[in-house]
């Protein structure tokens, strides 16, 4: 079994810790790059749910890049699914909802998120939403969340002042 195979068998927190050690970066360096406190970063290496529920998509993409992987790799998904560009998901969802405020409200109630910034295609949408949002949205529209997440790329993330590229 190769080293990468071992990473696939770990929980998310342990995988992040192992990738950090492999990268040679310190907890402080990663915390600074992500705009977190050291304690906030350490939570990522201790709690499996932190990556999905606390970091914005932009922060998660940055972490994956710094650790030499992609979002699905951070989550331990060995199989790389098809990618559906997030713009296509957005336009299909907008078409499905049409101009119905009721349909939009029903979706928001179902996933417990405001979809406004996502539907508007705001440059900042990846700073507003988490991976947990992508999972809930994908489930609601009956699409594999991995396909949706694979369609989110660093091109969707606006540059953040103070974070090195």
Region spans (language model):
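Short alpha-helical DNA-recognition segment
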Residues: 24-46, 98-122
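Short C-terminal boundary/hinge segments that cap the last helix of small helical domains
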Residues: 65-82, 142-158
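Alpha-helical residues within the helix-turn-helix
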Residues: 21, 32, 65, 109, ...
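Mid-protein regulatory/catalytic core that forms ligand/cofactor-binding pockets
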Residues: 113-165
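Residues that mark the N-terminal boundary/hinge immediately upstream of a DNA-recognition element
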Residues: 15, 26, 59, 70, ...
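Short, basic-rich loop-to-helix N-cap that marks the start of a DNA-contacting helix
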Residues: 48-65, 123-139
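A short, Lys/Arg-rich alpha-helix, primarily the initiator
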Residues: 1-22, 79-106, 146-150
């Amino acid at each position: 079994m190769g080293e990468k195979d071992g990473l696939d068998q770990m929980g998310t927190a342990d995988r992040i810790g192992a990738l950090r050690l492999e990268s040679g970066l310190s907890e402080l360096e990663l915390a600074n790059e992500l705009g977190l406190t050291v304690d906030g970063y350490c939570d990522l290496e201790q709690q499996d749910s932190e990556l999905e529920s606390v970091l914005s998509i932009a922060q998660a993409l940055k972490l994956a890049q710094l650790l030499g992987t992609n979002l699905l790799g951070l989550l331990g998904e060995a199989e790389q699914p098809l990618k559906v560009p997030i713009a296509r998901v957005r336009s299909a969802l907008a078409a499905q909802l049409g101009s119905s405020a009721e349909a939009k409200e029903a979706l928001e109630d179902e996933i417990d998120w405001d979809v406004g910034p996502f539907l508007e295609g705001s440059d900042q949408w990846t700073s507003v939403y988490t991976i947990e949002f992508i999972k809930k949205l994908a489930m609601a529209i009956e699409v594999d969340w991995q396909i949706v997440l694979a369609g989110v790329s660093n091109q969707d993330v606006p540059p953040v002042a103070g974070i090195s590229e």
